[in-house]
């Protein structure tokens, strides 16, 4: 199919939620992409940081083929060997004791927000429901995650936002401490801000956030890809 026809088909049938670059990609190998006209590109986007192994990696293709021959999706109502094996690898190589599998960063953040409020309800009291997030942050495009996002440009057109969120400057432990109230249940932040313009905090900032959370018995939510 020619490039113009590919783009026309998409424009006619897919909701216009992205400002697309006018090229139609048809093939990838490693860090390289080709469009429908045969033009080659270097892929620095990596599916917005989710395809870091590149395109058509032989080991990835082999694993997908193997799994497709055995089982497709069966839901979390049942046990499967690969799910447990991957979870075990993740827990052994991270701080985590448990893993929650989901489909997107926004879904992960939604779950984290729910977990923070659930934790507070069961351990601190039902009046503790507020989350503190950072100005110039980005946490997703669902209702809860655009509310958590500290940028008005992502919230425009979707008000009223959800209750229970407040924003403080990134890399400012004093402002964070001042923002905590008897209703606070957690602090949510990116270790390095991306959408706000690659902002790296001071070396001790995250340790100070951890200390603040521990002292107030609230959860620290780290949004990292």
Question: Model features per residue range: what roles?
Answer:
Residues 87-186:
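PLP-dependent aspartate aminotransferase-fold enzymes
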Residues 23-43:
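Active-site and channel-lining beta-strand-loop segments
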Residues 10, 14, 18, 68, ...:
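Structural signal for hydrophobic packing residues in well-ordered secondary-structure cores
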Residues 181, 199-225:
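Catalytic PLP-binding core of fold-type I/II PLP enzymes
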Residues 39, 186, 219-220:
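Hydrophobic "anchor" residues on beta-strands that sit immediately upstream
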Residues 184-198:
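Short acidic, glycine-rich surface-loop motifs adjacent to enzyme active sites
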Residues 40-126:
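Glycine-rich loop-to-alpha-helix module at the N-terminal edge of alpha/beta enzyme cores
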Residues 1-29:
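Active-site-adjacent loop/helix segments that line or gate small-molecule/cofactor pockets in enzymes
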């Amino acid at each position: 199919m020619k490039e113009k026809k590919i783009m026309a088909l998409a424009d006619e049938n897919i909701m216009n939620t992205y400002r697309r670059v006018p090229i139609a990609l048809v093939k990838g190998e490693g860090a390289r992409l080709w469009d429908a006209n045969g033009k080659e590109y270097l892929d620095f986007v990596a599916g917005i940081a989710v395809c870091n192994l590149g395109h058509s990696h032989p080991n990835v293709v082999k694993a997908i083929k193997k799994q497709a021959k055995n089982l497709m999706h069966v839901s979390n109502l049942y046990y499967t060997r690969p799910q447990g094996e991957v979870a075990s690898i993740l827990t052994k190589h991270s701080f985590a004791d448990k893993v929650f599998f989901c489909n997107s960063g926004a879904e992960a953040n939604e779950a984290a927000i729910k977990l923070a409020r659930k934790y507070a309800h069961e351990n601190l009291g039902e009046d503790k429901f507020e989350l503190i997030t950072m100005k110039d942050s980005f946490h997703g495009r669902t209702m809860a995650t655009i509310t958590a996002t500290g940028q008005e440009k992502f919230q425009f057109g979707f008000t009223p936002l959800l209750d229970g969120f407040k924003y403080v400057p990134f890399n400012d432990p004093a402002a964070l401490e001042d923002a905590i109230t008897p209703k606070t249940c957690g602090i949510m932040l990116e270790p390095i801000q991306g959408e706000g313009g690659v902002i790296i905090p001071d070396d001790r900032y995250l340790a100070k956030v951890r200390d603040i959370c521990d002292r107030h018995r609230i959860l620290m939510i780290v949004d990292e890809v």
